């Protein structure tokens, strides 16, 4: 049987995600971001709610990406997620993309030319952002023209690199409906960005997600719920460079801006440059918020939920893969658990995110 992996955030789950799951083949394993997502933001609703949405729409197994995989640049995010999915026994990786290319061919190219492509990337001028450098590399080696604002395609190219040299079939699925960053409310398939933007519009959410009731019932948070704590950490930390990926320049820019701004968006605008993208700045601010430092990734894989098929699959691999189904006295990943504790502070009705939680099973009360 085909075992398909899907890397996702489902922030929140919408009809485009439902379509992606419907097109994936065989048993479907989702490696999903936890309570903080790749672009350096808190998820709108918590990881347990999002796992339930996935399971109700065709996923067979949902596992959590550790914090230092979830909140990373595209290449590290992709590599960490693919590594976890490979340990879970996938043979296919399905992903949405705005542009359909022969990604399998690109993966073979990278496996053969990785050293030269990496050297080319390193030689590009520093005034270019990493996404710009990556686009230039693929244009030079594979003839791919600049893709503009195509975040799913750019992430797909990171999956190409992460899958190079592995026995993994790539299944690109054409993205339908609104663009990734579109905030439009008049699209047939609205984006997660639009749902987050218009979350107060109940009718819009109800027409945009098959799980609208779950989304609307759950505690919802944004960056602004955490700004006072972020500001406190910035103002009271003696050395911001002790936190993950905070260099001297970023520390200086953040410290200089923090006293004169009133929101996270204003802080990001003040700190970002051509070299430091807004996404990178948001990730750095997330690291400061949760006091993240460099740490090894956990050996165990945290299971958020499963169907009957998913449970049967877990039984076939549990002897060779350390699976965590309940976090108790022994921690799974201390950094991810600290991030969960911070996340809980964002809303007075936010349920416990770690201790005593057990995997979700469709149709069963958690």
From Swiss-Prot:
Gene3D superfamilies hit by this protein: HUPs
A GO-annotated cellular component: cytoplasm
What EC designation does it have?
6.3.4.-
- Record's catalysed reaction(s): cytidine(34) in elongator tRNA(Met) + acetate + ATP = N(4)-acetylcytidine(34) in elongator tRNA(Met) + AMP + diphosphate
* One Gene Ontology biological process: tRNA modification
- What positions does the entry give for ATP binding? 7-20, 96, 152, 175
Q: Which GO terms describe its molecular function?
A: ATP binding; ligase activity, forming carbon-nitrogen bonds; tRNA binding
For this UniProt record, give its keywords in alphabetical order, as a comma-separated list: ATP-binding, Cytoplasm, Ligase, Nucleotide-binding, RNA-binding, tRNA processing, tRNA-binding
Q: Which family does it belong to?
A: Belongs to the TmcAL family.
The protein's job, in short, is: Catalyzes the formation of N(4)-acetylcytidine (ac(4)C) at the wobble position of elongator tRNA(Met), using acetate and ATP as substrates. First activates an acetate ion to form acetyladenylate (Ac-AMP) and then transfers the acetyl group to tRNA to form ac(4)C34.
Concerning PANTHER family, the annotation shows: TRNA(MET) CYTIDINE ACETATE LIGASE
Q: What is this protein called?
A: tRNA(Met) cytidine acetate ligase
